[in-house]
Amino acid sequence: MYMCHGKDNIPFHTMILPGLLLALDENYHLPDVMVASQYVNIDSEKISKSKGNGITILDMIKEYDVDSLRYYMIAYGPENADINFTMENYINVHNSDLVNKFGNFINRTLNFKGLESIVPAKMNEEISKVISEKYIIISKYIEKLEFRKACAEIIDLIEIGNKYYDERKPWIDYKENIEEFNNTIYTCTNIIANLSNMLEPLIPGKTERIRKYLKLDKAKWEIITIDKEIEVSNSMEILFERIK
């Protein structure tokens, strides 16, 4: 069992609370792992009620996407050191990771102009190997509570997908070699399907939409390979809008 708290609560949660629970003699299962996060500062200042410089999550989700905020706080959160939250940095991360990299990869694959269905074709063996390795690497990081590194591995897979797409040039094969076009789109779609598994803890609202569009079952922590034709006559809606 994991117990998560801020670093200012370490003495209470590691000594006083366990002592109180033991004194009750109710055979409670005490935490196996203590997780203490660092502080989130805002614009280089500690959050202070007297200064009124705090921003609540409820206020943030009124203006910004909840999955985007969840992703930012896990991928760039105060894991081992205090972080300085600024709106500029948050917006840059949102637009870079979620719009330019992830969103663009999905859009150019699933919303390819003229694409009516994704057919089971030949999966790129090297990409398949990379996906399998990512599950192992990410799992180890999560078990060690190194969430930032886990997220970095996911972004790396997205970048691998984008690079593969660019190198394969499906916009040319669509006109000249439909078999190779199908292989490329099929491989990229399988990357997206597995990303929906890996990103489930971070952006569950968006991964659910991906699985629904691709007619996939619930997320599971193992490599999946699409084995049936998927009609994509209706465009996949944009997952993340660019913040200006």
Predicted features, each with a name:
Residues M1-K7, L24-D32:
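NTP-dependent nucleotidyl-transfer catalytic core
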Residues I106-I138, I158, N162-N177:
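Conserved, charged catalytic cores of large soluble enzymes
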Residues M1-H5, N84-I91, S139, N177-I178:
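Glycine- and acidic
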Residues D32-A36, R211-Y213:
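Beta-strand segments within the central parallel beta-sheet cores of soluble alpha/beta enzyme folds
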Residues I83, I155-K244:
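Basic, alpha-helical terminal appendages of large translation-related enzymes
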Residues Q38-E125, D217-L239, I243:
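Catalytic adenosine-cofactor/nucleotide-binding cores of aminoacyl-tRNA synthetases and other
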Residues T14-L24:
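Short active-site loop/helix that positions an aromatic residue
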Residues H13, F102, I154, P204:
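Residue-level signal for inorganic ion chemistry
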